[in-house]
Amino acid sequence: MHLRDLTGPEQLKRLAPAELAQLAAEIRRVILETVATNGGHLAPNLGVVELTLALHIVFDSPRDKILWDVSHQSYVHKLLTGRLHQFHTLRQFGGIAGFTDPRESVHDHFHWGHASTSISAAVGMAKARDLAGDDYEVVAVIGDGALTGGMAYEALDHAGHDKTKVIVVLNDNSMSIAPNVGGISNYLARIRTGPSYQRVKHDVAEALRQIPLIGPQALELADRLKEGVKHLLVHNMFFEDLGFTYLGPVDGHNVSALVDVLRQARAYPGPTVVHVVTTKGKGVPYAEQLPDKFHGGGPFDVATGRTGPGSLTYSEVFGNVMCKLAAEDPRVCAITAAMPSGTGLSRFARQFPDRYFDVGIAEQHAVTFAAGLAKGGMRPVFAVYSTFLQRAYDQVIHDVALQNLPVTLAIDRGGLVEDGATHQGVFDVAYLRAIPNMVVMAPKDENELQHMLYTALCHDGPAALRYPRGKAQGVPLDETLQPLPIGRGEVMQEGADVALIGLGTMARVCQEAARLLAEKSISAMVINPRFVKPLDAELLLRAGREVGAVVTVEEACLAGGFGSAVLELYAAHGVNARVERMGIPDEFVDHGQPARYLERYGLTPEGVAQRAEALLLRMRSDLAAQPARRSRSVRRLSGAKAAGNGET
């Protein structure tokens, strides 16, 4: 059977092993070609082809609920559930998502993109099933990397104690995003490669195969008994101690073996863990060799895996400056939550291994760990995607800001990204500026980024700087770094008619918008505020009082954002300026090219210029109407006085 002939996952149950192997090869080809064109998560999906086939053979989706942790590895699932003909639109504006999305299919149950959540949701769905008297299965598919997140253990502890019937499929590829770290990774490795267990398993199998006539039957019987043997040879069975039945490890690229073990799990009455060992990037040599690089990213050459040359990214600039500062100051440390490459810290990890800490997918721990480092006299920098910092908000407030500790939050992917609602970095400005003691910065370009990082490390308190994903602007980089005055912005150009205030990279957009306005004889002041908190009150108040027409522009949510901060400042000082706020409205932003969304929200030079013109037009219209309004008010007031005097 070809993939194009597949109308639903129920057809998989009737396919022979050879047909399944052919289908697996075709699925890998489709995924490779699509991701090479559109970008996306290549290696994780290549590694789960056979596992996904087996899941849909054993379980009856959508009645049985298959939940994909993070769900970046759900491409195969999408192809098997009727989305082949839309698959070429993967991650494109108006196309299908790179993660599960219930709006797309009844086979998708959550709109996910963060790690370690699937077991909690599965336990909740299973409990709802039991309360309703239903009997469908609930399966959580989670990677070994996601098991470094504490939330997964909270759910395992709950399910094991409660004996809720739920199946947890542990996809163990020893990687997740980057090479896994920590005790759990080492524990799983011992299960996979423990010499006692593996040696006995091999020797027994070989001996049984040699028995004439009954060898195969004896081997099958031994397979059924091996769980008991495993208890004797692998000590401290973690999952068993939590109350789960443990099955595995199983070859994650053997469909028949996977089907057998999943059927066993389905037959168990209580919670079960199925340990599946896979190869990330399976079937594509360059993805197998460099699974970290091909975890997720942009387009590449399908034959070689190479990407085109280009200028430095903001992440790379950040990483280079971190190395420079660490060489000068032995107190500088770097922390990542399983994203060394994505955050630009790979070089730092090589040069300063003693001051580099990958804590796994554990953002809460990362922030409080940074607080401990700072309390001990170090200058820690936690490099984290904006969307993932949300997971550690309490720790930022309670363990860092309340203690007023010198922890730097280097917030990558601040703004719009291709991956959609689960990954948009648009909330950080609003939630960080509400925190006392916190300094919040946004650079207009990569040169300002390096000065802001130095500023944060010189500051004796918590500081955050947010910068976007992707290529930097290509401006020259200063050799000598200088700390910026805290709370001081920059006037990029003076103007008399309207003030354009662009946060971060929007400052450059405002500068170009000012040029467009100048062509229409409109004089625009352009301000790079640099600081969300503390604001440059003197500069912003001058713009409000002297210019009167103000447009704030931010690649962040409007609710509680930078524009709101400016309005609060004006209200507190009685400044009667007309303020037009531009940014992300009160909605979740879907997947697609950020440029398309910037255009939709008017966050382009043309869009900003148009809003500024419209604001000035309204102000002129209001000014022209003021004499008429005043005369109507006088007439109404005169009439009221006349009525009070008995006049008619």
Swiss-Prot record:
GO terms for biological process: 1-deoxy-D-xylulose 5-phosphate biosynthetic process; isopentenyl diphosphate biosynthetic process, methylerythritol 4-phosphate pathway; terpenoid biosynthetic process; thiamine biosynthetic process. GO terms for molecular function: 1-deoxy-D-xylulose-5-phosphate synthase activity; magnesium ion binding; thiamine pyrophosphate binding. It catalyses: D-glyceraldehyde 3-phosphate + pyruvate + H(+) = 1-deoxy-D-xylulose 5-phosphate + CO2. Thiamine diphosphate binds at residues 72, 113-115, 145-146, 173, 363. SUPFAM superfamilies: Thiamin diphosphate-binding fold (THDP-binding) (SSF52518), TK C-terminal domain-like (SSF52922). Its cofactor is Mg(2+); thiamine diphosphate. Pathway: Metabolic intermediate biosynthesis; 1-deoxy-D-xylulose 5-phosphate biosynthesis; 1-deoxy-D-xylulose 5-phosphate from D-glyceraldehyde 3-phosphate and pyruvate: step 1/1. Binds 1 Mg(2+) ion per subunit. SMART domains: Transket_pyr (SM00861). InterPro entries: Dxylulose-5-P_synthase, THDP-binding, Transketo_C/PFOR_II, Transketolase-like_Pyr-bd, Transketolase_C, Transketolase_CS. Its EC number is 2.2.1.7. The keyword Membrane does not apply. It is an enzyme of class 2 (transferase). Catalyzes the acyloin condensation reaction between C atoms 2 and 3 of pyruvate and glyceraldehyde 3-phosphate to yield 1-deoxy-D-xylulose-5-phosphate (DXP). Belongs to the transketolase family. DXPS subfamily. This is 1-deoxy-D-xylulose-5-phosphate synthase.
